[in-house]
Amino acid sequence: MHYSATPETDAVIEPRDLLLIDSGGQYLEGTTDITRTFALGPVTDEQKKHFTAVLCSMLNLANAKFLHGMTGIGLDILARGPIWDMGIDYRCGTGHGVSYLMSVHEGPNSFRWHKSPTRNEDTVQEPGMVTTDEPGVYIEGSHGIRTENELVCRKLEENEYGQFLGFEIITCAPIDLDAVIPDQMSPRQRGWLNDYHAFVQKTLLPLMADDGEREWLRHATRAI
């Protein structure tokens, strides 16, 4: 699941299959943790199905609406559901807390479906908490896929039923549409993806001076 290249195990990057890059950095504005998987060329139908399932999983969790008191262990199924529907699983949590200029993995907040004696899955999601949303599919000897954004918990409406909460995606990077099967997504999920890419385009275009880069971004964030 985590790969460190050695002379014995390194792989040549070729114009085919998928490439997963998990990256991040420390900035005065905060700590980033982001993963994107890219189609470097032709990919198989299975790889596209898995890529799209991971995308749907990420979007399902990012667009959750829930009452205050909900824990990460209760929300995890929203992400894991599309992948469980395929009869497979990723053997790790869906997300972890992120600190501010300290550890990129910091509790107590997380998303995972089962309890562990070394973790606190009973932590309630609170406004302002930053948690990663990173479902994946990992097929040994074949391919690995992960799409990761950071989410910040926000207050929504409060009424007689209680305080509703949701998430704001604060990661701003295109998702490779060349590996997506639109018909595998529900209309709602396609709308969520298009809304996210509109946000990415609106945020990043003003920061780009090069016409070629701006044209690339418009294409990378096109509606499907």
Annotate each language-model stretch with its function.
Residues 1-224:
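Active-site neighborhoods and metal-handling regions in enzymes and metal-associated proteins
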